[in-house]
Structure formats: structure tokens, C-alpha cells
Amino acid sequence: MKKQLFILGTIAAIALSGCSTNTKDTNNSSMGNMGSMNHEGMHHSGSGQVPQGLQTAANPKYKVGSQATIKADHMAGMNGAKATIVGAYDTTVYAVSYTPTTGGEKVKNHKWIVQEELEHAGDQPLKPGTEVTLKADHMEGMNGAKATIDSAEKATVYMVDYTATDGQKVKNHQWVTESELVK
């Protein structure tokens, strides 16, 4: 009888151990479907360093230190989050599609890469369809990846600190465009 109870208890313990929840799991599988972008490996917070040659905006709508609400869904918890402006820069900003250097699925329509994060891009805007090499590390496998420009626009881009709607604190997020912010 004791042996049967021991076996039954062991089986129950094994079965129940598969039901536990790891609350420290911070992978990006909870991000849901955000367009065709794959956000696995996304570097939510950045170092705060800006690419060489990126020019500070002369007269940005949102000044450094001011607050705005993000109206973009590059990442889970971003849309509707309150942000503090850390930097404002005038440049050409691109949405790109690329295959990570680490392998895996092609990332489509990644927003945003700035002109200064493209290898040998020069200072003139590039046209959609142009093949480029990325010098950014917003996501794993991005730096050095071959990419195709999906769209391009002259814009003021912002580096922001914000608390995601799920409570995660994000520092120095690169990049949010002026059109993706509201007061």
C-alpha cells in the first residue's frame, strides 16, 4: 500500500511540475502578431549611443526631457506608453526587410533604421528596393545583415525612455518617428 501511494505521489508531482509558470520568462513570445516583424531577439533598451554623423534636430516638436505618448506598436507594450524624450535627430528613416546573420526567418518591414545605420549610404536618401548592409544592432543578427529598403522618409526621429504597458522599463529605445508621438 505504501509503495502504491509513493508511486502515485511521484506521478502526481511529475505531472504537476509541468503546470508551473516561470514568471521571470522575458522572451518576446508574448508580443503577439505585430505586422510581419519578428521581434525575437529585440534589444528593448539601448546604450544611448547614436550612430556617427547623426545630426541633433535643430527644432524638434518634442524637446529632450519632454513627455509624449507613443502611438506605434514596434514592440509589445509600446502603443499607448508614456515616453520621455532622450534625443531628437533629423535624418532619413527607413523600414527594411532583412534575413538575420544568425539565421532564422526573414524580418519584414522593420521600423526604424536611420541613414547613419547603413553601411556606405552616403548622405542622400536611398530609394525603396535598394539593397543595403545594416550597421545597427536593434535586434540579434541585424548588424552586418543584407537588407532591402521597404520605405524611406525624411523625418525627426527620437530616442525615448518609456515604461511599457506591461510594466517593463525601456531605456534609450531607438527609434520612434515624430508622427508616432502625441502630446
List PLM regions with ranges.
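Bacterial signal peptide processing site
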Residues: 20-22
